[in-house]
Amino acid sequence: MNTPAYAEIGITTNFSFLRGGSDPRAYVHQASILGISAIGIADHNTLAGVVRAYKELDNDKVLHKPKLLIGARIVFIDGTPDILVYPRDRAAYGRLCQLLTRGKRGDDVTRIEKGECRLTFSDLLAFSEGQLLVLTLPHRFEPAQALDVLAKLKATRAEGVWLAASLVHRGDDRRRLARLDDLATTAKVQLLATNEVLYHDPARRPLQDVLTCIREKTTIEAVGRKLEANAERFLKTPREMSRLFRDFPDAIAETMRFANKIDFSLDQLRYQYPDEPVPPGKTAQGHLEDLTWAGVDKYFAGKIDDKLRATLKKELALIAELKYAHYFLTVHDIVHYARSQNILCQGRGSAANSAVCYVLGITSVDPTKVDLLFERFISKERLEPPDIDVDFEHSRREEVMQYVYRRYGRHRAAIIATIIHYRPRSAIRDVGKALGLTEDVTAALADTVWGSWGSGLNDMQVKQAGLDPQNPMINLAVELATELIEFPRHLSQHVGGYVLTQDRLDTYVPIGNAAMDDRTFIEWDKDDVDALNMMKVDVLALGMLTCIRKCFDLIDQHKGERWVLASVPQDDPKVYDMLCDGESLGVFQVESRAQMNMLPRLKPRTFYDLVIEVAIVRPGPIQGDMVHPYLRRRNGQEKVNYPSPSPEHGPADELYKVLHKTKGVPLFQEQAMRIAIEAAKFTSEEANGLRRSMATFRNVGTIGKYEDKLIGNMVARGYDPNFARSCFDQIKGFGSYGFPESHAASFAQLVYISSWLKYHHPDAFCCGLLNSQPMGFYAPAQIVGDARKNGVEVRDIDVSYSFAQNTLEQGSGKYCAVRLGFRQIDGFHWLDEDEEHLKRSLLSFRGAPLGANPESIGPHMPGGMDSGLDAGASPRNDKKEDWANRIVAARNRRPFTSLEDFARDTGLPKRALILLADADAFRSLGLDRREALWQVRRLPDDVPLPLFEAATAREQPDEHAKPLPLMPRPEQVVADYQTIRLSLKGHPMEFLREMLSRERVVACKDVNHQNERRRVRCAGVVLVRQRPGSASGVVFMTLEDETGIANVVVWPKIMEQYRKEVMGARLILVEGYIQSSPEKVTHLIAQRMVDRSHDLIGLANDSLTRKHPVPSGDALIEPLNDDRRDHADAPAQKIRHPRNVRILPPSRDFH
């Protein structure tokens, strides 16, 4: 007897977050192996995982292709049993998306919180047309309710109604199936067999149990009946399902009738990019060409050579052929809006290969100075939509994002999703909690994991956590955590990628609310969108643009010089001299220790040298062993030659055009692609596949299939095997993270501009960096220290002189002085001027009438405005008080004369006064930190307003007749670091120097003057830890003391031996030997490491517990710590245990 065909329609994937135990792709493969005819993905109130299953059907390893049914399991908030919803056709699919959007977004009255979906049965009925509806019932159910639901479903315009039948394996399955069959007969619906699958293979049962515990916030011991009763909820063979339903064979046959009714596939989504408004009588292409030639007049005064003119015409012709004009007009419009609001922006990525993008003002790479490869941006052969990435100031990017929403409407525009996956740290923490391990144990395991990435924990790491890897519970925790890694945890927003549509976006994919009031995003991520050929616009944020704009503003305000990106003088030899010395702290892209070390070796003297500098310290060139050959050739230590094939296979200069700018060594992605085409003779299709495989680190696993072909073809044509291998290794490195030349050129513009600012205006550069935090490699203490080293005076925070932001004052030397602002005080409330920009722009958007001319809200060509604004979308309600500007406003009325005068005039709460006193901000009033704290303590909790002061005046007793002892300098420095994260009074290490010298520990600056291979001991505060993927497990550490910094290299063996110290120490002692390069770049190669953080804690403990004569009953006030920020009326805390005292801000770790 033949086994009947079977379709499993009740599959829950791991995109039903913390419910499903298997990835959608695993189900496709398992169904193929088991011979299942169709699989129905029905995740809980979401379509987030369906594209992954759809794409996996194209995998060559899936030999038998099951039919994919796209649906969702609707879970209601009104007690209705779950219903599986499968759309029959494209129109019904759109209604399912709109149903889910309603549940995730709400309406004009009710806003749904991020991650929730609140649907009622009546919501489903309103969107039921064209749907195949399957009612699922719990183990125990009320027949009357079920019959009522079935009757109401049948009364809709649905394509059909079914009753799901599944076995629960609790001993009463036959009786339960008979009840369900009777119910279906009574309701006149068909019974539909399903295993209500939760995982693809029974081995996943333990992980699914753990997911249940994580979801329910409980442990395996306490979870009880919330777990599945058995391990039967896996994908079963048609034969097994037929056996289980042998008494109800029609329920099995009905699964195929059900599947055959569904005509919808994601192939049917016909994406259309929105039309852009153009002048009357113009087409989009004609308008784009007009803007292009107008840009030629603007950027080149109309005078361009024949080569550039031909390039522009070629690009415009291809844009016309592929019908991309509207897309270019969109990006031009967004950039134009940003510039109209004085928001700096710059395009990057493959778009920098386009001359059209340059003359439209989107990118900044001059096509007359850099060779462009337009085919990398747009290609007729690839048939992939263009992807233009534009960076905006990170502090004002939200204004641009809200403009996009307003411009297109929230039903036509949304941010794409980012899937937050489990990483090793989060996996071990959540699994450990679920298994009942203590917090100490899970924290110890998690703390052995470097960064966010990795494949799990090994026995060595378990031992370093002080645990036994052979312990069954520890072993199980590690095993399950390893399984959980890469599972989706929840959806978040992409950093700025928008999808825009001509018709309603919510008929393509559900849209939900983000955590921020004015943001909405779809359920699909970048890879999903790319797979369906949907075009996106990237509105990205870049902190350096914010910094540069703030620098320009400061220079204009305080020095009377006006600069824009394009006006900064180019090719300044003094700027390049600074970079050749490795002086690049704070400079965009070249401030890491690896880049600082590379600068003296590469010795950049031209803009193109900076392009190479940006690209060369990347996994591609490093893994391909291209860095050292390039440097040797650049420095004249090695002859420049160009790899060539055998004479019978091609000319000797076959690769000259590809490699001549980089001295015969491939450094960029474009070069790797051209080598594949020219030297390995890849077809355009093969080269495109290779390009896609190295597009992001996530696809590293797919690149191996090109290895034999690329290396084999090159060797067969006479290329040196070592060169062929290096080329492929380089391509693999680009798969991890590498820069195309166009992208490096875009970033090199900002490298030069930030370097120019650092050299010529170090005062403004320091101030701009501080006002743009958080960004970059270095903390405020190092930024300030570098500025002072370069001759900039930096002044303390003071209530009589400081503003919210750090600013410039008249200096006594060559540069202005930097006055630290109130924003530097941890926990102090201040509002950024950029937040005010956003509020004003949102209010102006709200004021523009729907359907108004776009000119009313931005610089557009005349055309209708989409009426997509939500009534519930209002400006962000920021309830944070602006203490800083209250001080400035009071100060402008009259100078402060005393602390009581200050408190009365500003009306600040007592907590704000304590923070200011902690920050030593009352010096201009004759009060040091201790005296100010004392006086604040004596003030009443509520300072009266001046009008009522006389009525409530009471005499303040003079509780002490003599001045308080001066606070010692070590105590001052510690207090500074605790409150403002830096100190102008000293460095904590200088107070440990005497002790360290007795231990023969040298200062950081002295490390750089030791002889090669000399053994030394050095100690310092850990500023930065780096473990680049290209460094094969090597860790680079930057240590700082009062004399400067030292670079430490930790080889993998030493890293494993001292993992705890490397990852956890704030102050570390390193013993090792010196290694120096000819360019005088010195490293300390670690051989032994000791965590000396307790010395810092001891310093703080002395400061916090030092006995002083204070009145009985009063405790010495310590600086506030972070956990008191949100409690305005919180009393002063008692002195904490030294291990909990924060001495220094944490290091900045990169991987």
UniProtKB/Swiss-Prot annotation:
One GO location term (cellular component): cytoplasm
GO biological process terms, semicolon-separated: DNA repair; DNA replication
Region described as Disordered: 1108-1151
Enzyme class: transferase
Pfam families: DNA_pol3_alpha, DNA_pol3_finger, HHH_6, PHP, tRNA_anti-codon
Catalytic activity: DNA(n) + a 2'-deoxyribonucleoside 5'-triphosphate = DNA(n+1) + diphosphate
Keywords: Cytoplasm, DNA damage, DNA repair, DNA replication, DNA-directed DNA polymerase, Nucleotidyltransferase, Transferase
UniProt GO MF annotations: 3'-5' exonuclease activity; DNA-directed DNA polymerase activity; nucleic acid binding
E.C. designation(s): 2.7.7.7
UniProt subcellular location: Cytoplasm
Keyword Iron-sulfur annotated: no
Annotated PANTHER family: DNA POLYMERASE III SUBUNIT ALPHA (PTHR32294), ERROR-PRONE DNA POLYMERASE (PTHR32294:SF4)
Function: DNA polymerase involved in damage-induced mutagenesis and translesion synthesis (TLS). It is not the major replicative DNA polymerase.
Family the entry assigns: Belongs to the DNA polymerase type-C family. DnaE2 subfamily.
Protein name as annotated: Error-prone DNA polymerase
Organism the protein comes from: Bradyrhizobium diazoefficiens (strain JCM 10833 / BCRC 13528 / IAM 13628 / NBRC 14792 / USDA 110)
